[in-house]
Amino acid sequence: MHITSEPAILYFGTPVVLVSTVNENGTYNLAPMSSAWWLAWRCVLGFGAHSKTPQNMIRTGECVLNLPSADMTGAVNRLALTTGSNPVPASKIARGYRYDPEKFATAGLTARRSEAVAPPRVMECPVQLEATVESVHPLAEQDEKWHGRLLAIEVRIRRVHLSEAILAEDDSNRIDPDKWRPLIMSFQHFYGLTPNRLSDSRLARIPESLYRAS
């Protein structure tokens, strides 16, 4: 039996992505997100328009998409309620965010030089995708509650770096899905490719109702 429902969020489960970008002063920003999907060598990323990451991407035209494995929940959690925006936007203050100019250090992760773009890769992530911005699309423009608040950014993957540990034995251009265990975000909780929750996410402390447009 089904019932009509109106959840505040529709995060049914997608891979966590750590997006690295370059700030105005040349330092690095690193932000976790999970509103992402791929088709061919393109990826579409969903952001709040006033977040630091999309602002950096639009300004520089570059980013790196770093995909953590399921054993990296600790590092991702340490980033979960941080922002590179100073001052912190009111909407993020309401959710418990704080300004952090040293995201790599906070997460305990290592910045590694990229080959095709300026933002660094995350050395610990098994998948590292250097990318450039192709187009920016506002979302929900017809909804006065969301007008100007959401963006979909299409990026083109320029360089793919993969850990040898997740590659197929007979083909270095193919990932073995039996070896790759992505970290999944589902309704603000961390999961892997197993039925059980891996650990609690700090984002789960935020009431889902705070994500409704007001």
Stretches with model-predicted labels:
Residues 1-214:
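Basic, polyanion-binding surface patches
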